[in-house]
A protein has these predicted regions:
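Short, charged recognition helix plus adjacent turn
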Residues: 69-97
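Recognition helix of helix-turn-helix/homeodomain-like DNA-binding domains
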Residues: 31-48, 69
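A detector for short, charged/polar N-terminal pre-domain segments
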Residues: 1-8
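Short basic helix-loop element that most often maps to the first helix and adjoining turn
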Residues: 11-30
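Conserved binding/catalytic microenvironments
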Residues: 5, 98-394
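DNA major-groove recognition helix of helix-turn-helix/homeodomain DNA-binding modules
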Residues: 51-66
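Helix-turn-helix DNA-binding elements, focusing on the entry/boundary residues of the two helices
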Residues: 13, 24, 35, 50-53
Length: 394
């Protein structure tokens, strides 16, 4: 169910078109949608079908959720891609011939899917990552000796993008296989920082199984194996592992362990000094603040004051990747619902959706909070009902 009027959708498409310096004719040509349809959609006279919306979004280099807030076709696109993704990695260790793209073209495509993952643009990942992963696996097996480390790093990044959709859409077996591929490629890269990134992502397996104690042990093992934080990238790798360890310790009810790891993460965030993306993981002082919220919420409703205090003192800047910001607002909404602040909780959920619609729609806590608000609170009932239909909480 769309929460936008036809006029709002049309204005959004027109604004994106102008930002890319396209005429309506140019957009029609690029999207393979008729000029009459583009013109009618932009003036709010016609509702675009899912196929038309996706074609326009692809031509404008955005995800369809950025054109229509209530768009739910991403789930269909992801589920259509998952069998192909599974098939691609079935024999990743077996050479299958050369890739269809050269090194430079692959490098650009890999950087693009990393950006999409950080921006929670799962529909775009689903469209591109099966074929890209196939090519990068082939590149790993055929690259010259001097390119082997680069090829392995590219495979780690691409498999991680595939894992993003598998994990977010609760295909945990496929997610675990992709993480195994990441670890295999990280070993081929023979780079401790790449291995640290793979260990960071591996924690998803433990989250999914609720195996918090062994997950914490695995992260602490990875921290001990990580290089000394003598450079910004090494400090970021170690700091990200400490952030992850703090959250899984919190999920396991280990408040002291969570605080210890959070302290280490904070120190390393201060050392890094500025927020950045390091081997596909966002780290810096702002990410540490977001994980302060994560830890407080992970520890449970008895720590709600701690969670609310984080939000009183700090809010995520727009410069942070969309998935990070969305996660913060979802966790804040959970704390606000615990604190009997339903209006604030709903505002936080809407902020999460504005930051990353696909991430919010697939987040179990966002659905849980929405369902609770709808059952027990009547404020803004019509708007909340629209939101609940969109997120699948009805």
């Amino acid at each position: 169910m769309s929460v936008d009027s036809l006029r709002e959708v049309g204005e959004r498409i027109a604004a994106r078109r102008r930002a890319r310096r396209l005429t309506q004719t140019g957009l029609a040509t690029a999207s393979h949608v008729s000029y009459a349809t583009v013109r009618a959609v932009e003036r709010g006279a016609r509702r675009p079908s899912d196929e038309v919306l996706e074609a326009l979004a692809a031509a404008l280099a955005v995800d369809a959720t950025q054109l229509r807030t209530g768009y739910v076709g991403t789930e269909r696109r992801v589920h259509q891609a998952l069998p192909a993704l599974s098939a691609v990695i079935a024999g990743y260790d077996i050479p299958q011939g050369p890739p269809t793209r050269g090194h430079a073209e692959l490098a650009v495509a890999v950087d693009e899917v990393v950006d999409w993952r950080l921006g929670a643009q799962y529909g775009r990942i689903a469209t591109e990552v099966p074929a890209l992963l196939c090519d990068v696996i082939r590149y790993v097996h055929t690259a010259r000796a001097a390119e082997q480390q680069t090829a392995a790093r590219m495979l780690v990044a691409t498999a991680r993008a595939g894992d993003a959709i598998a994990f977010k859409y609760r295909e945990h077996d496929l997610s675990a296989r992709l993480i195994d591929l990441m670890r295999w490629a990280a070993d081929r890269a023979a780079d401790p920082l790449v291995q640290a990134a793979a260990a960071y992502v591996r924690t998803e397996i433990f989250f999914a199984a609720r195996a918090h104690a062994v997950g914490l042990a695995a992260l602490e093992q990875a921290i001990h194996a990580a290089p000394a934080p003598s450079s910004r990238s090494a400090a970021a790798a170690r700091g990200a592992l400490h952030m992850r360890a703090a959250v899984i310790a919190g999920r396991g009810g280990d408040a002291n362990g969570a605080d210890t790891h959070l302290t280490h993460a904070r120190q390393l965030g201060d050392q890094v000094a500025r927020e950045g993306v390091y081997l596909g993981t966002t780290f810096g002082p702002d990410s540490v603040r977001i994980h302060e919220m994560s830890v407080a919420v992970s520890l449970g409703s008895n720590h709600v004051d701690r969670a609310l205090r984080v939000a009183t003192e700090w809010m995520p800047p727009a410069s942070l990747p969309a998935e990070r910001r969305s996660g913060f607002y979802i966790e804040l909404a959970r704390a606000q619902e615990w604190a009997n602040l339903p209006g604030d909780a709903f505002e936080s959920l809407k902020a999460a959706r504005a930051a990353a619609p696909q991430h919010t729609r697939e987040h179990p806590w966002a659905r849980e909070v929405t369902s609770s608000l709808r059952r027990f609170h009547r404020a803004d009932a019509e708007s909340l009902s629209h939101f609940a239909h969109w997120i699948g909480a009805v």
